[in-house]
């Protein structure tokens, strides 16, 4: 059974910098998946429960973060990682949510929303607006 997660990105505080997507990944479990874009949204389509995707953002001030979304045991989850070094790409971060990796505990929490403030004061939030079913939706907010 396939799942999709459609993300809408909102940037509320341009003084913190404008964030652009610089990388997209999909983990290979559950037949992997794909990212697509339409009308300003980013949609992760996955082959089944048990996989995820990561978007890596960089601001025009050099701040790097990742937003991870996925489905684990038929339930959505999300995470934001801040304070990244240039070599900490989405390709590096995505597998850390699996196989007892350092971020696996976050996936297993199956959070419907998560927020964090970076060391430089930028607040990041992911909040699912459609939390059940196979066609999930979430807002990603930078402020």
Swiss-Prot record:
Record's description of how this protein is used: Lectins can be used to recognize and purifiy specific glycoproteins, and for the purification of cells with specific surface glycoproteins. Has potential as anti-proliferative agent.
Chain positions recorded as N-acetyl-alpha-D-galactosamine binding sites: 49-50, 72-73
Organism: Boletus edulis
Known role: Lectin that recognizes O-linked galactose-beta-1,3-N-acetylgalactosamine, a disaccharide (Thomsen-Friedenreich antigen or T-disaccharide), present on cell surface glycoproteins. Can also bind chitin, N,N'-diacetylchitobiose, N-acetylgalactosamine and N-acetylglucosamine. Inhibits proliferation of colon, breast and liver cancer cell lines (in vitro).
A molecular function (GO) term: carbohydrate binding
Binding site for N-acetyl-alpha-D-glucosamine: 79-82, 103, 114
Binding site for N,N'-diacetylchitobiose: 79-82, 103, 114
Binding site for beta-D-Gal-(1->3)-alpha-D-GalNAc: 30, 49-50, 72-73
UniProt KW keywords: Lectin
InterPro entries xrefs: Cytolysin/lectin, Fruit_body_lectin_fun
Protein name as it appears in the record: Boletus edulis lectin
Family: Belongs to the fungal fruit body lectin family.
Pfam families associated with the record: FB_lectin (PF07367)
Assembly description: Homotetramer.
